[in-house]
Amino acid sequence: MARWNVCSYCGREFEPGTGKMFVRNDGRVLFFCSSKCEKYYFMGRNPRKLKWTKAFQEARLQRAKRK
């Protein structure tokens, strides 16, 4: 069984054969589940400020634990 990829921007898992793989000049590999994630990454948007990303949801849980 093939390994599922994890989006480098939003953290969502997606099936192999879908999405895009981007290889940076330093050799680091980035996977994107959608063109939306890819565009937001290259525009420099912070995933912790977008409610639909896993990074935002994890940060929100950490803030709730502190209170």
Swiss-Prot record:
Sequence intervals crossing the membrane: none
GO terms (BP aspect): translation
Cofactor note: Binds 1 zinc ion per subunit.
Any coiled-coil regions, as ranges: none
Protein keywords: Metal-binding, Ribonucleoprotein, Ribosomal protein, RNA-binding, rRNA-binding, Zinc, Zinc-finger
Top-level taxonomic group: Archaea
GO molecular function: rRNA binding; structural constituent of ribosome; zinc ion binding
GO CC annotations on file: ribonucleoprotein complex; ribosome
Subunit architecture: Part of the 50S ribosomal subunit. Forms a cluster with proteins L3 and L14.
Protein family membership: Belongs to the eukaryotic ribosomal protein eL24 family.
Function per UniProt: Binds to the 23S rRNA.
HAMAP family registered for this protein in UniProt: Ribosomal_eL24
Protein name as it appears in the record: Large ribosomal subunit protein eL24
Source organism: Thermococcus kodakarensis (strain ATCC BAA-918 / JCM 12380 / KOD1) (Pyrococcus kodakaraensis (strain KOD1))
